[in-house]
């Protein structure tokens, strides 16, 4: 069965960095479909200007990979519902959906990391967008994405050494490794509703 890997987390959580190690070396997944990388390829000095075109290219590539039943990975903040239908379609096509969510303690930590990335030549994201995506992503993780994934895990990426917080399977039990952080995440998932 083919695999769809969802590499998720707020802006600055380390998704791309982790993807370049985990996907090819550990999971043997050679297809990483990333709109940010596509945009940077189209317009290296102004990737924001081609975001819509990059999104179209990304969706076309995903459709080709699914038609060919190839393993592939996507990267997302989960801040929108846009991938729920993709996940459902992939499951219908026989894909096994595996989600890894990289968690940071707060939107402030995410903003700090993004600012650091910008200082090193990375792309900028406005603070209000980072904050909205932080809470939106956590809320959607809990309410939309965990319920439709075959396997999922949440990793604390706020520390120097990453820590597994929780993992679970579709409609089955979950194993909580750090209950304090898991409770914090559940509280954060309600922040979007305020």
PLM segments and residue spans:
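NTP-dependent small-molecule kinase module
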Residues: 143-194
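Glycine-rich phosphate-binding loop used to anchor ATP phosphates in small-molecule kinases
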Residues: 53-104, 137, 153
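Pre-Walker A (Motif I) flank of P-loop NTPase domains
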Residues: 1-4, 68-70
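Walker A (P-loop) phosphate-binding loop of P-loop NTPases
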Residues: 12
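Conserved lysine of the Walker
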Residues: 15
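The Walker A (P-loop) glycine that initiates the GxxxxGKT/S ATP-binding motif of P-loop NTPases
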Residues: 6-9
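A glycine- and Lys/Arg-enriched "phosphate-lid" helix/loop adjacent to the NTP-binding pocket
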Residues: 95-144
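Conserved substrate/cofactor phosphate-moiety recognition/catalytic segment
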Residues: 19-70
